[in-house]
Amino acid sequence: KHTDILSHHAIAAGRYAPQKGFDMLISAWAIVARKHPEWQLSIYGEGDLKDQLQKQIDELGLKDKCMLCHTVANIADKYCMSSIFVLSSRYEGFGLVLAEAMAYGVPCVSFACPHGPSDIIRNSEDGLLVEKENVEELADRICYLIDNESVRCEMGKKARENVERFMPENV
C-alpha cells in the first residue's frame, strides 16, 4: 500500500502536547489555507492541549480546513489518503511517525530538530527540513510541495526507497 499522492490532504500525528508543536503547525496552516483553500489538514492524536488547539483553529477561521482527529487503530489508512506528512515537533527522538509515513511514500516536511528528523529525512530528496520553529518557512515548504506535484511524487518515491535503511533487516 502507498499514498494517494494526488489527494489534497496533509496529516500530522502525535500527542496534543507542547513538544509536538501543533500550535505552530496550525499557525502555518493558516498561511497555507489562504493560498490553497482546497487543501485540508488532519491532526491525529489525543492529549491535554486538545481544547486549546481547537480554540486556535476556530480563532484562525480554519474550522473546515484543519481538523483534530482521534487517534486511530490503523494510521496506515490515513497515510494512504494523504499527500504530505508534517512533523512540527519542538524536539523529537527517532520520530517513528516520519519513518512510517515515508514507508507509505508520503513526502514529509519537518522542523530540523537536532536528532530524529534530521537523521531520517534527506533534505530536498525524500522530504523537506525547515529551520526549527520557523512557522513561515514551514508554511512555505508545505506550499512548495502543494504547488509542485511532480516534486511531491518524486519525493514520495524516494521516501519509500530511503526509509528501507531503517528496516530491521538493514539495521
Protein language model regions, located:
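Aromatic "clamp/platform" in nucleotide-sugar-dependent glycosyltransferases that forms part
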Residues: 71, 90
